[in-house]
């Protein structure tokens, strides 16, 4: 996502995510366990599990943790619980559209928490469908710009079925249709191209440019949502220039 991905990169460089690693692993484990419960423990035959496992690996979760999460989903007396997937939609300051993907065992608690976070940070929780039309589901693979040349990446990605390849800051951004995502990821791996992350994402079709003040408010809202235990993913359609991002992160 324009702006958001850059902010995430800045946070990683500053080490801000280190303190949240335990909470992140707990969320990733929950997603793996539920995916294994719903579709079986073989990633080759369960695309949802394959994506959850890949996301965990991208976050450097130990393989033992990943396997234990799969076992919880497939074993007798599963700890997966009665979790359900819910998507909330709303607005951040500046008219920024926000989508929040939740995996929760308590729908009422999740709704209350998400509504409170939006309200506290100057946003507003909307109704189903209020902003979803502003996004489209895409596969997104981020490749470090110094890991591969443009021509080599373009050839491998497009041959595997990618839709587009563009430079976004210090990363190449490979975009695919959801149906081609797994094939493109596999194609890059077979070509020996190292990528930093690969996931299905809700990509904004248009973006809202933010000044420094509104960017700070919006990013505080995004961070608060991401820190909630039930929240798996947050998507927003803001765009923050390099100059404003540097001011916000300074």
Curated annotation (Swiss-Prot):
Pfam families: TACO1_YebC_N, Transcrip_reg
UniProt KW keywords: Cytoplasm, DNA-binding, Transcription, Transcription regulation
Disulfide topology: none
Keyword flag Transcription regulation: yes
Keyword Repeat: no
UniProt-listed PANTHER family: TRANSCRIPTIONAL REGULATORY PROTEIN YEBC-RELATED (PTHR12532:SF6), TRANSLATIONAL ACTIVATOR OF CYTOCHROME C OXIDASE 1 (PTHR12532)
Protein name (record): Probable transcriptional regulatory protein Rxyl_1318
Naturally occurring in which organism (per UniProt): Rubrobacter xylanophilus (strain DSM 9941 / JCM 11954 / NBRC 16129 / PRD-1)
């Amino acid at each position: 996502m324009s702006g958001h991905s850059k902010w995430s990169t800045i946070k990683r460089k500053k080490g801000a995510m280190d303190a949240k690693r335990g909470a992140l692993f707990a969320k990733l484990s929950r997603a793996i366990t539920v995916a294994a419960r719903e579709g079986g423990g073989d990633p080759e035959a369960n695309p949802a599990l394959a994506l959850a496992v890949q996301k965990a690996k991208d976050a450097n979760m130990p393989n033992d943790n990943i396997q234990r999460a799969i076992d919880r989903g497939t074993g007798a007396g599963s700890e997966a619980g009665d979790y359900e997937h819910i998507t909330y939609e709303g607005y951040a300051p500046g008219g920024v559209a926000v989508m929040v993907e939740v995996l929760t065992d308590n729908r009422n608690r999740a709704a209350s928490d998400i509504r409170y976070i939006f309200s506290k940070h100057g946003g507003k929780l909307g109704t189903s469908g209020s902003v979803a039309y502003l996004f489209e589901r895409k596969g997104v693979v981020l490749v470090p710009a110094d890991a591969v040349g443009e021509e080599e990446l373009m050839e491998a990605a497009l041959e595997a079925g990618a839709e587009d390849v563009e430079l976004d800051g210090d990363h190449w951004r490979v975009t695919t249709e959801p149906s081609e995502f797994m094939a493109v990821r596999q194609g890059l791996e077979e070509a020996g191209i190292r990528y930093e992350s690969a996931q299905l994402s809700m990509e904004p079709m248009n973006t809202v440019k933010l000044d420094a003040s509104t960017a700070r408010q919006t990013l505080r809202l995004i961070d608060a949502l991401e820190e909630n235990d039930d929240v798996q993913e947050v998507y927003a359609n803001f765009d923050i220039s390099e100059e404003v991002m540097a001011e916000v992160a300074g």
